[in-house]
């Protein structure tokens, strides 16, 4: 047992979403436990402890579920359940979009670039969260891509998941007029730029701070810190 292992109650929820009752040599629960272990500790796949399934099998499912949308389906189902538990409707009506550039290691990282604004060599993760800070969509790309044109990919991924009530995304000034027009025409989605107070000193941007908090949550896991 590791601190990252799924509890019985958590696995029961995920098992219902996966709806897969086939007998396997390695259970899907143990596979997900291995993925969570890698995410939290940041270890290499080949360095997985011996009491977890073979790393090749774990990576196979991680890669397969990334490509076939299983991770997105799991995330959406869990987001909807969490929102209902908080007394909200399953589908959000407002989201917050932002990006974060992070440094990468020298080896094994495709699509790297240099973010001239943040002075960071690495990749940029573009995310959309709801007003609870729950992640709705993610796209990762080279850090040298500007927020406005690359945001189309994350907006398209977000809308493809079928959040029917979504009407507005809150953003910073990096998201230009062309992007806002495109989102309105393509998805009838309003992208509203939330301005920071003009007074001297530090001021929290209304609602936009929630996406920054989500980035901070990500940093709790070593695999997501780079």
Q: PLM ranges: what are they?
A:
Residues 1-226:
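Short alpha-helical elements
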């Amino acid at each position: 047992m590791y601190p990252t292992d799924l509890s019985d109650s958590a696995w029961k929820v995920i098992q219902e979403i996966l709806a897969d009752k086939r007998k396997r040599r390695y259970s899907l629960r143990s596979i997900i436990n291995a993925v969570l272990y890698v995410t939290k500790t940041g270890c290499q796949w080949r360095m997985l402890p011996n009491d977890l399934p073979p790393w090749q099998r774990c990576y196979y499912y991680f890669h397969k579920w990334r490509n076939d949308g299983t991770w997105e389906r799991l995330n959406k189902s869990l987001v909807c359940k969490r929102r209902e538990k908080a007394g909200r409707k399953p589908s959000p009506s407002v989201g917050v979009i932002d990006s974060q550039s992070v440094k990468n290691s020298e080896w094994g990282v495709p699509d790297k670039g240099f973010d001239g604004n943040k002075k960071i060599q690495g990749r940029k993760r573009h995310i959309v969260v709801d007003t609870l800070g729950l992640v709705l969509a993610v796209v990762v790309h080279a850090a040298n891509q500007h927020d406005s044109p690359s945001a189309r990919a994350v907006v398209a991924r977000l809308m493809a998941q079928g959040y029917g009530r979504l009407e507005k995304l809150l953003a910073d000034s990096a998201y230009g007029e062309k992007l806002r027009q495109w989102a309105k025409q393509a998805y009838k989605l309003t992208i509203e730029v939330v301005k920071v107070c003009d007074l001297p000193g530090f001021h929290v941007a209304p609602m936009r701070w929630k996406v920054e908090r989500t980035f901070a949550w990500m940093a709790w896991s070593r695999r997501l810190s780079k």
